[in-house]
Design a protein with these regions (language model features):
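Polar/charged alpha-helical tracts
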Residues: 5-8, 12, 21-32, 76-79, ...
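Polar/acidic, low-complexity leader/linker segments enriched in S/T/G and N/D
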Residues: 1-68, 73
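General secretory precursor processing signal
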Residues: 63-65, 135, 148, 235-237, ...
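Acidic/negatively charged segments and metal-coordination signatures
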Residues: 166-261
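Residue microenvironments linked to proteolytic maturation
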Residues: 91-202
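Conserved aromatic-histidine-acidic binding/catalytic patches
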Residues: 47-50, 69, 111, 115, ...
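Extracellular-facing segments of soluble proteins and assemblies that are Gly/Ser/Thr-biased and enriched
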Residues: 57-113
Length: 261
């Protein structure tokens, strides 16, 4: 099977030389053939390999955007990668034998932690009618639809298609379900991303080993003109008098120490 050979390539350094466009076309052709036999195990493996290739492509794109200082666009790609890994795990697929996927998952999380984003918009909506992408039936308890959103059937991931909804409100949150709806002043200005501005130029290629530790440091209160009832400059969302004013050390901020090869 072609897909088995592809996965063996992904598990080695040969993945750098893969023609992704050609491989995706061949995998889709092989999936169509296997669908006639409804071999769920093989179709799940093909879906996984297609998703793995998509993850690698997106990571290359993300790295390119970071180098171009397009940090917000790179952030959105990182979220797509994160969601793909969630989908893979939801289908009980183990990929610990594939170093490139292990690397990308690790560094996706590490890169996200370097962003200054703290507040996100979280819309609240009532889904009045949702239909299944596999069978087209309404997805409600006790319906005829037996499919589970997020699971793979015949090589395709099931998802709910929202046909009717009511918009309720928008909340400001620190732990969002959708990370792309970030609230950040002057979001396209690269100079607002100080940590990324420091480390990204030092990364010479997409796949090198680098690490960092985060410590809490403090700036003198005198660096800020702030009232007791103003929001604390540390970004906690709390009032100054209930936050850094209490520590008697200054305004807290994260200090990063990087280790590069």
């Amino acid at each position: 099977m072609f897909y088995l050979n592809v996965y063996e390539e992904l598990k080695t350094s040969r993945f750098h030389n893969i023609n992704f466009l050609e491989y995706k076309k061949k995998l889709e052709e092989e999936k169509k053939i296997l669908k006639t036999g409804h071999n769920q195990d093989e179709l799940l493996k093909i879906w996984f390999i297609q998703t793995a290739i998509e993850i690698i492509e997106q990571y290359y794109e993300c790295f390119s955007l970071l180098k171009k200082r397009s940090y917000q666009k790179a952030w959105n790609i990182l979220e797509k990668i994160e969601i793909s890994f969630i989908n893979i795990k939801f289908n009980n697929i183990i990929y610990s034998d594939c170093p490139v996927l292990v690397y990308i998952e690790k560094y996706t999380y590490m890169l996200q932690k370097l962003y200054p984003y703290k507040i996100f918009a979280s819309p609240e909506m009532l889904h009045k009618k949702v239909v299944c992408s596999v069978c087209g039936k309404t997805m409600i308890p006790f319906s005829d639809c037996l499919h589970i959103a997020g699971k793979v059937y015949d090589g395709e991931m099931c998802y709910g298609i929202v046909k009717e909804l009511d918009f309720i409100n928008v909340a400001m949150v620190t732990k969002p379900n959708q990370k792309y709806s970030v609230c950040f002043q002057d979001i396209e200005n690269p100079k607002r991303y100080k940590v990324l501005e420091y480390i990204i130029p030092k990364l010479k290629s997409e796949f090198i080993q680098w690490t960092y530790n985060i410590y809490t440091d403090y700036e003198p209160y005198s660096n800020y003109k702030i009232g007791r009832n103003d929001l604390c400059p540390c970004g906690s969302g709390k009032k100054f008098k209930r936050c850094c004013l209490l520590n008697n050390q200054g305004i807290a901020y994260p200090h990063y120490e990087f280790t590069l090869p």
